[in-house]
Curated annotation (Swiss-Prot):
Modification sites for Cysteine methyl ester: C181
Primary gene name: rap1b
Superkingdom of the source species: Eukaryota
Record protein name field: Ras-related protein Rap-1b
Matching SMART domains: RAB, RAN, RAS, RHO
Binding site residues for GTP: 10-17, 57-61, 116-119
Membrane as UniProt keyword: yes
Source organism per UniProt: Cyprinus carpio
InterPro entries reported in the protein's UniProt record: P-loop_NTPase (IPR027417), Rap1 (IPR038851), Small_GTP-bd (IPR005225), Small_GTPase (IPR001806), Small_GTPase_Ras-type (IPR020849)
Propeptide regions on this chain: 182-184
Cellular component, GO annotation: anchoring junction; cytosol; plasma membrane
One Pfam family here: Ras
Length: 184
């Protein structure tokens, strides 16, 4: 079974843990409890393939920055999360993406831009088109709006990253085996 190392990044309070726990355990975490680092494992089926996801739920961008390079070095796919109710959390993501590309030393990194808390439409300050435009600027990276509370697009975030990783690095052993003939 193929393993995938996914990293959830973004400012404090955007709902990184809520999305991760909703995906892994099917529970909405109401209370805000700042994360230092939590790791979760979940087996899922994506496009008929069994996958083991290892999801690293990280501290907000303003904390524990020394650990961030290590997450980025080891991660294969990244969910960059902002809250649609806080412009500053959206603005923080540009530097985060640049840091990922610098650490990975490539522009071709599986990334999904996630506008979380889309259930709070009355409190929206970051328009959906702002997210779409930023995703286009980022080499047309994937973009979704989500809500951990309302279970909107939660699974899709992680499944999309798995699909991006599969496109970038196809499953080994899928190629047709060459047959050889030996004369003795």
């Amino acid at each position: 079974m193929r393993e995938y190392k996914l990293v959830v990044l973004g400012s404090g309070g955007v709902g990184k843990s809520a999305l991760t726990v909703q995906f892994v355990q099917g529970i909405f975490v109401e209370k805000y409890d700042p994360t230092i680092e939590d790791s979760y494992r979940k087996q899922v089926e994506v496009d008929g393939q069994q996958c083991m996801l290892e999801i690293l739920d990280t501290a907000g961008t303003e904390q524990f920055t020394a650990m961030r390079d290590l997450y980025m070095k080891n991660g294969q796919g990244f969910a960059l999360v902002y809250s649609i109710t806080a412009q500053s959390t959206f603005n923080d993501l540009q530097d985060l993406r640049e840091q990922i590309l610098r650490v990975k030393d490539t522009d071709d990194v599986p990334i999904i831009l996630v506008g979380n808390k889309c259930d709070l439409e009355d409190e929206r300050v970051v328009g959906k088109e702002q997210g779409q435009n930023l995703a286009r600027q980022w080499n047309s990276c994937a973009f979704l709006e989500s809500s951990a509370k309302s279970k909107i697009n939660v699974n899709e975030i992680f499944y999309d990253l798995v699909r991006q990783i599969n496109r970038k690095t196809p499953v080994p052993g899928k190629a047709r085996k060459k047959s050889t003939c030996q004369l003795l």
